[in-house]
């Protein structure tokens, strides 16, 4: 019961996360656009920090969604089934790994929202959700592609940990994969912050 419920949570959350991030990033970008074509944050002397603050805000919302949904699942399983040796620690570790895998999408979707608009951000988020749903139906294809496609990171790494309740997984260097995902997020975030500091805005239609 615990394993099946956890796998369902991982799959459903991995499909929701891209569209959730896409919508939130789209709304954030649209608010700045409507407030004056990004003039407020672009004219700030700390425009890079302002962009970083928006990214951290989105990460905070994402973290709340993931933690809340996992705690809801944990409490539900505990109250209904009362399984033995079912502690909160593995659930929290699963949540942390899920969040690490999702981080890359935040600066990416925020950049899409600012550069291409709210519609593009939401559209790419929807495509990410569809892609996760599709690729999860083909395990062999998923195994070959997941490391190079950020939308699959949460699904794969979280599933690997949850099914083994360990970072030591035969045939997979899970700590290295998580480190690469986190470093990729940091590098992208730095790159987008530097881009935004020099961005001159876009014409408002």
Regions found by a protein language model. Name each.
Residues 1-20, 25, 55-118, 126, ...:
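Secretory targeting signals
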Residues 1-3, 128-205:
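Terminal transmembrane helical anchor/hairpin motif
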Residues 25, 36-37, 108, 150:
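Hydrophobic alpha-helical segments typical of transmembrane helices
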Residues 26-60:
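Helix-loop-helix units of permease transmembrane domains in multi-pass membrane transporters
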Residues 28, 37-40, 75, 111, ...:
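A residue-level signal for alpha-helical anchor/packing sites in multi-pass solute transporters
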Residues 31, 43, 74-78, 114, ...:
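Transmembrane helix-loop junction
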Residues 49, 120-121:
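Residue-level recognition of membrane-helix boundary sites in multi-pass small-molecule transporters
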């Amino acid at each position: 019961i615990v394993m099946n419920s956890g796998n369902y949570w991982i799959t459903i959350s991995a499909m929701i996360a891209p569209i959730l991030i896409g919508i939130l990033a789209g709304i954030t970008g649209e608010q700045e656009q409507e407030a004056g074509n990004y003039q407020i944050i672009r004219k700030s002397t700390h425009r890079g920090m302002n962009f970083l603050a928006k990214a951290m805000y989105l990460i905070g919302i994402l973290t709340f969604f993931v933690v809340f949904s996992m705690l809801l699942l944990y409490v539900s399983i505990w109250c209904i089934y009362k399984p033995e040796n079912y502690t909160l620690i593995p659930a929290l570790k699963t949540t942390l790994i899920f969040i690490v895998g999702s981080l890359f999408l935040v600066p990416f979707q925020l950049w899409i929202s600012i550069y291409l608009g709210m519609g593009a951000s939401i559209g790419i988020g929807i495509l990410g959700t569809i892609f996760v749903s599709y690729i999860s139906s083909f395990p062999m294809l998923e195994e070959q592609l997941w490391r190079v496609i950020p939308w699959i990171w949460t699904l794969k790494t979280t599933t690997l940990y949850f099914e083994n309740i360990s970072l030591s997984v035969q045939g997979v260097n899970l700590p290295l994969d998580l480190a690469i995902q986190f470093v990729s997020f940091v590098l992208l975030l730095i790159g987008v912050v530097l881009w935004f500091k020099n961005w001159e805005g876009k014409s408002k239609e």
